[in-house]
Amino acid sequence: MSETPLHWQTITTLSQQIHRGTLSPVALMEHLLDRAEALDGTLHAFRLIPRDRALAAAQAAELTLRAGQDAGPLHGIPFAVKDIIDVNGLPTTAGSHLLQDNVVSANATVVERLLQAGMVLLGKAQTVQFAFGAPGINHHHGTPHNPWHATPHVPGGSSSGSGVSVAAGMVPMALGTDTGGSVRIPAALCGTVGLKTTVGQVSRAGVFPLSWTLDSVGPLTRSVQDAALVYQAMRGPDPADPSTHNASFQDVLSGFTDGVRGLRLSVAESVFWEETDPDIVSAVLRCGDVLTTLGAHVDSLAFLEADEALAAASFGLIGAAEAYVDHLERLGERFDEYDPIVSTRMLRAKDATPMDYLRAIRAHNALCHKAQRTLRDVDALLAPTTMIPSLPVSEVDSSLEVYHQWNSRYSRNTRVANMLGLCALTVPCGLTSHGLPIGLMIMGKASDEAMVLRVGHAFEQATDWHHRTPDLSWAE
């Protein structure tokens, strides 16, 4: 069997070679930079790639390792960040021309922690404008091209470039943010792993906000083990983010390989399955069979059935209202300069009253508590990450009304975890009859990232879906 090319390897295997001295961080960075620059004219995954800076960082990582200063398993590993996350000396545009000159002077906390762990930045990935859209479309900076189809298909959003950059082998990890599915949707549609962290586990300081109630930061990777390594490095309290002050933090690597024998895993019923693509239904149900074979007790659970309408309405109001207020403070009344697919959603909150917002927040808090009670005796929930696979951009973006319909469909399943305060992981679990990726969503209790990562790793070890890669001969 031929050796796996560097660009398809996981952080774990790359790290082993770097620490053995058989792979130079500089050689790895050069390989990935060359690949990104060769493909990105077609795929549009990146907002910017500062090549000289990336190579200098890789050289520094190599020199410190030679000097015996080993920062750990992430030392010398390239990564990308969604362009709403601050990187010192680079612009954070949030996918909008209105912020094209917004060069920042400090790193976001998550970036600083990954740099301290030895990682090296390759570039900033494209995003939906202001991180507000599930299909991944951006009319101002360009829509990243899902690498699994030669005809333009949606990558999922809003961490669109993050999903494409990992799926196309440009970087082994990219940071995204998740307010209603923005890590998990592109991960599922592009065939990667994506972790939605519990609010308070990972600092959001230095991240352009969408919703201070619902925003979270998480990695997109090639394997669950990689996601665990990155999460372990970036989680923890931060004085600059009050949401982290009262959180408890697990060692997610302890027990990571314990498997699922004896665990109760419940297939979430009700809304998660309505009008879902038949290929997705079949693939996700087969996941239950795999986990049963591994020793888990797999059953079904009526989840959210009576509260789905309340959760959806409250989620929509919280997200739109908090975004609207924040944008008024930052950019003023310039909504006519926004992409209509974004401004029309924000402006829905213009006529909302303080009482409407407070009711939505109260519903959010009540649903979070109810979810924790419901899941008291359940280790994790299983569901399709999305109800539909990636579709042609021309179909999703044919009109503003049609776009909003597809936007709601893409986020229908994922937004549940955000509204209920859960953590969630998506892992590749199949391909449709058209060869497009399918994601299994594993949801866990608040701050129980260790469990969803453990279940995801066990599933991944028993299957080979995370090893599947797109044929990119049409893009090279």
Language-model regions: role of each:
Residues 81, 121-124, 175-177, 300, ...:
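General beta-strand structural signal in soluble alpha/beta enzymes
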Residues 1-55, 293, 468-476:
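An N-terminal boundary/leader segment
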Residues 21, 32, 76, 116, ...:
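Glycine-rich, small-residue loops and helix-cap segments
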Residues 106-237, 418-439:
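Short glycine/serine-rich loop segments
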Residues 22-30, 59, 278-302, 328-333, ...:
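Acyltransferase
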Residues 54-56, 64-141:
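Acidic/His- and Gly-rich active-site-bordering loop/insert found
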Residues 196-282, 287, 308, 457, ...:
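A short helix-breaking turn/cap at a secondary-structure junction
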